């Protein structure tokens, strides 16, 4: 029987080396063997250092080099037979490859990626980024591409319009064959992706903090103006909770969007009209505007229509990329973007490096934004 075993294990090894990582259940079906038989093969191959095991997945072992610069045996430096890579190996340049899927490296996500890269490289690993440009299904395509190039784990920001998956959306994220951390995304209880680690800013707290500050200055009717982004729902939740908790008067309702998506120009015009009407007819004296770039564009147009900032309308922006460069320096809530990337990367590397972190409880981390006051 041994020749059959050898041939099967050789086939397993070839598939893992070609694909980078393979789910054990899928591999058993592909080879037409029972999961029990395949697990015995995997245990033997992992003990020889030919493959690594983790989270129901087997991955290839990257070949290293010995002190003389020669190719080391496949198992050399690979860590334990169960696929755990010692933390010391990471700090010494153990060669783990982290894949990161984000919509873009512009604006918000630029700092997230920079934070992740700094944390990954500080531990001797490498980061490879895949961009989705918010294209449908491109997040899954990029995740598959990174896995095919040998990524040992994924930092994942799916294209979920509301920041969390809609009905029937995103189930695939929970079936990925490697350790995965959601970055700046959330999944509701009961959704498969809720079982994943995740790291994000607490945008609801950031919005509430802005409302608290404005209320402390004496404002009783505060508006929220935000275009639709993955952050918007959490801003609305925090804003609404703070208005209720502080007993503030409700601002005029945001106008309904009507049928079909609006262009950026139409959205901007609607926001301008809303704020002008809220001040002149609705008794609003302060506003939280998302984002700071929108606020900087809105303020001169508000002033052109007779709404003075800050005399008639005090403004705090959500995000702090350019708020300090406005003609009227704007106070701003700054999400901890770089820290989110770094904490997500560290959490993923802790999972991959083994020890108690590998099988420990999943973590949902929310980092509090900072409020910067400018006079």
Regions inferred by a protein language model and the residue ranges of each:
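Flexible loop/turn connectors
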Residues: 277-375
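HTH-adjacent hinge/linker in prokaryotic transcriptional regulators
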Residues: 3-7, 18-21, 42-127
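Flexible loop/hinge segments that line or gate small-molecule binding clefts
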Residues: 157-208, 293, 319-330
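Hydrophobic alpha-helical segments within soluble ligand-binding/sensing domains
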Residues: 187-189, 196-224, 234, 265-275, ...
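Short beta-strand elements in bilobed, periplasmic/extracellular small-molecule ligand-binding domains
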Residues: 121-131, 240-268
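Short, solvent-exposed amphipathic alpha-helices that sit
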Residues: 11, 108-122, 206-209, 230-250, ...
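An alpha-beta-alpha
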Residues: 208-248, 361-375
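Periplasmic-binding protein-like
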Residues: 99, 151-159, 223-226, 280-291, ...
């Amino acid at each position: 029987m041994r020749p059959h075993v050898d041939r099967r294990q050789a086939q397993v090894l070839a598939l893992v080396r070609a694909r980078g990582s393979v789910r054990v259940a899928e591999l058993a079906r592909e080879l037409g063997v029972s999961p029990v038989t395949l697990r015995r093969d995997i245990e033997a191959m992992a003990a020889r250092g030919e493959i690594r095991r983790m989270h129901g997945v087997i991955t290839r072992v990257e070949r290293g080099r010995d002190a003389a610069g020669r190719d080391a045996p496949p198992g050399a430096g690979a860590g334990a037979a169960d696929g755990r890579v010692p933390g010391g190996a990471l700090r010494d340049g153990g060669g783990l490859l982290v894949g990161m899927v984000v919509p873009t490296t512009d604006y918000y996500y630029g700092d997230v990626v920079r934070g992740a890269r700094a944390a990954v490289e500080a531990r001797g690993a490498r980061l490879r980024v895949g961009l989705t440009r918010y294209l449908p299904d491109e997040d899954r395509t990029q995740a598959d591409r990174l896995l095919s190039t040998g990524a040992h784990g994924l930092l994942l920001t799916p294209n979920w319009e509301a920041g969390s998956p809609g009905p029937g959306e995103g189930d695939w994220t929970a079936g990925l064959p490697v350790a995965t951390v959601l970055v700046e995304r959330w999944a509701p209880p009961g959704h498969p992706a809720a079982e994943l680690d995740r790291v994000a800013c607490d945008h609801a707290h950031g919005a509430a903090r802005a409302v608290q500050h404005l209320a402390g200055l004496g404002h009783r009717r505060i508006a929220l103006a935000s275009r639709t982004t993955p952050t918007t729902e959490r801003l609305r939740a925090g804003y609404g909770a703070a208005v209720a908790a502080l007993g503030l008067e409700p601002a005029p309702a945001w106008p309904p969007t009507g049928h079909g998506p609006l262009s950026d120009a139409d959205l901007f015009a609607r926001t301008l009209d809303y704020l002008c009407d809220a001040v002149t007819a609705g008794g609003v004296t302060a506003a939280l505007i998302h984002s700071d770039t929108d606020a900087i564009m809105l303020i001169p147009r508000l002033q052109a229509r007779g709404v003075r900032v800050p005399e008639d309308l005090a403004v705090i922006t959500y995000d702090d990329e350019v708020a300090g460069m406005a003609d009227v320096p704007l106070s701003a809530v700054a999400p901890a973007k770089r820290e989110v990337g770094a904490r997500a990367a560290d959490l993923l590397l802790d999972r991959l490096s083994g020890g108690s972190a590998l099988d420990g409880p999943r973590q949902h981390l929310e980092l509090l934004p900072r409020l910067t006051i400018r006079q």
